């Protein structure tokens, strides 16, 4: 497993986090108290019913493996944003516990007020500890709370990449004090995939960074400008880069105040012999709506009242060729308004090219996952990151606190 440094790292890294898989293989978990920080933050409807149980299903292998090894298992997660220090039925993990019971084929009791201990979990049994964000001090990474939680366990397992960018008591503090701290299978898989994509990538390395605003992705763009061979921009971000290249974009969404930043990124790439491909054709409309008429235009023919809502077919074909020839692909964001089919061709063509490419591909971000689902390519993307904000912060080159503390523990 690799460390999360963006520099070139060896495959046998002494500071890579310890893993649950290694502990299970060593056979030392029988009778041990194992505390798993999972990501069970699932969407619910107005009645509180779970609408997508993907995260719960993803958490089952780690829990089941610990139970099979004879461990006494405690699982917790956040759910929504409850007020700290008070019970909040709207954010209770009760529905999660019911679904977890079904998936594990056994009762999973839900415990409230658990931070002070006073409960026993027999080996081979599992309990769900109520929403960790109800505990005073969770979000501020309280040292006192972290030590109380660490006293409950012999082994701490972080299996929640989605919160790895937050230093909270259950993601960071407890890992400092637990007798053993390690990465669960979901977290370990994310570390491996991200390390493979940016630590030692097979070249050419192509990144697709798309979205409505340059401002929200500027740090990512600057970070990747030093690393990638082609930086494909899409959506409103591409409009700003087109402006920077001296092209007209009509009344399209753009950020003129960031033109200097866009030009700087183009220059950094060019100095390295890398490129930011600027579209040669685009799909325009006079309004932003599901029924808007789409018109394919050469980039030099965009009218003052046009809105650019997708890349054109020539651009899509050109970029698809680059993706098919890539060694590594990092994908964050659809290149057009793919929710409206007449503006979805660019994203569809690129998605298909990623699926057909021999490159190792990693994709992340909510809109990207929706596009992957729409075009049915999930089983042909090398790795789909569920991290959201953590995935973006990794692309920015930031240290993720939850991973950093596990690396520190491994090093010591």
From Swiss-Prot:
One of its GO terms (cellular component) is cytosol. Belongs to the phosphoglycerate kinase family. GO terms for molecular function: ADP binding; ATP binding; phosphoglycerate kinase activity. It comes from the Bacteria. Its EC number is 2.7.2.3. Keywords: ATP-binding, Calvin cycle, Cytoplasm, Kinase, Nucleotide-binding, Plasmid, Transferase. Pathway: Carbohydrate biosynthesis; Calvin cycle. It catalyses: (2R)-3-phosphoglycerate + ATP = (2R)-3-phospho-glyceroyl phosphate + ADP. Monomer. GO terms for biological process: gluconeogenesis; glycolytic process; reductive pentose-phosphate cycle. PANTHER family: PHOSPHOGLYCERATE KINASE, PHOSPHOGLYCERATE KINASE 1, CHLOROPLASTIC-RELATED. Its main location: cytoplasm. The gene is cbbKP. The keyword ATP-binding applies. This is Phosphoglycerate kinase, plasmid.
């Amino acid at each position: 497993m690799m460390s999360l440094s963006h520099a070139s790292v060896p495959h046998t890294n002494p500071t890579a986090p310890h893993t649950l898989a290694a502990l299970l293989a060593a056979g030392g978990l029988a009778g041990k108290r194992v505390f798993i920080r999972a990501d069970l933050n699932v969407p619910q409807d107005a009645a509180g019913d779970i609408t997508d149980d993907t995260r719960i299903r993803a958490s089952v292998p780690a829990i089941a493996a610990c139970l099979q090894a004879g461990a006494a298992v405690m699982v917790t997660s956040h759910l929504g944003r409850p007020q700290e220090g008070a019970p909040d039925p709207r954010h209770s993990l009760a529905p999660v516990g019911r679904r977890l019971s079904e998936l594990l084929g056994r009762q999973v009791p839900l415990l409230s007020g658990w931070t002070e201990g006073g409960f026993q979990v027999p080996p081979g049994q599992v309990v769900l500890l109520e929403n960790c964000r109800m505990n005073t001090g969770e979000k501020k990474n309280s040292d006192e709370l972290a030590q109380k939680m660490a006293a409950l366990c012999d082994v701490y397992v972080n299996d929640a990449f989605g919160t790895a960018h937050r230093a909270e008591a259950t993601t960071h503090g407890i890992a400092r004090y637990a007798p053993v701290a390690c990465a669960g299978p979901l977290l370990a898989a994310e570390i491996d995939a991200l390390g493979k994509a940016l630590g030692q990538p097979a070249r050419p390395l192509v990144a697709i960074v798309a979205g409505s605003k340059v401002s929200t992705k500027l740090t990512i763009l600057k970070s990747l400008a030093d690393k990638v061979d082609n930086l494909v921009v899409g959506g409103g971000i591409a409009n700003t880069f087109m402006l920077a290249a001296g092209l007209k974009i009509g009344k399209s969404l753009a950020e003129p105040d960031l033109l200097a930043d866009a030009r700087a990124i183009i220059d950094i790439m060019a100095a390295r012999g890398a490129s930011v491909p600027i579209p040669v054709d685009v799909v325009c409309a006079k309004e932003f709506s599901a029924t808007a008429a789409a018109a394919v235009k050469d980039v030099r023919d965009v009218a003052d009242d046009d809105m650019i809502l997708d890349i054109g077919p020539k651009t899509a074909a050109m970029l698809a060729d680059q993706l098919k020839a890539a060694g590594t692909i990092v994908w964050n964001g659809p290149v057009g308004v793919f929710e409206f089919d007449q503006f979805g061709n660019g994203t569809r063509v690129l998605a298909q090219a990623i699926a057909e490419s021999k490159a190792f591909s990693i994709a992340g971000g909510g809109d990207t996952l929706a596009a992957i689902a729409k075009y049915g390519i999930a089983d042909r993307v090398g790795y789909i990151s569920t991290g959201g904000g953590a995935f973006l912060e990794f692309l920015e080159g930031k240290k993720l606190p939850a991973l950093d503390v596990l690396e520190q523990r491994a090093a010591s």
